[in-house]
Amino acid sequence: MEKFNVNKDDMIILLIDLQEKLVPVLHDNEYVINHTKAVLEMARIYDIPVITTRQYPKGLGDTVECLKEYETKVFDKVDFTAKLDDVMNEIKKIGRKQIVVVGAETHICVYQTIRDLIDDYKMIVLEDCVTSRRVENKMNAIANFREMNCLVINSETLIFDILKRAGSAEFKILSKLIK
């Protein structure tokens, strides 16, 4: 089924608002950051572009330090959605149609972004790489993503689907990150 296929050559990672002053108050933040880092390492290995947004950085700070090295392009915003002219121009310039979304908060910025892009892009959200302050808000958003026909998977599913097989140098690197 085409809906469930991922293609690293047609993929962009959209890292939404994992920022210094926001991450500490998010549910399961360390778990989410660790899984997000594994996905971003996969993106680096396979040359998948990473677009990062920062929500009101004056108040919420920069992207958390451990993820900054993976950023390809960074866009600041005050809107909750990432469907902004600058971001959309970058996505169109890259020319890929699958957008994998990671970040926060699931029920606000992640939700509005997926809702606003789902008609034009294949949207994929990684359930273990998104979070909110309250788990109930995250779970409500995840249920809505499924209703929107957004593909909801986890980081291991994505990584192993892209790897396809064991034994490669990439497998050895990435399998260590997700243990």
Language model segments and positions:
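Active-site-adjacent betaalpha module
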Residues: 2-12, 58-179
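N-terminal nucleotide-binding beta1-loop-alpha1 segment
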Residues: 12-18
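Short acidic, Gly/Ser-rich segments with clustered Asp/Glu that frequently serve as metal-coordination loops
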Residues: 20-24
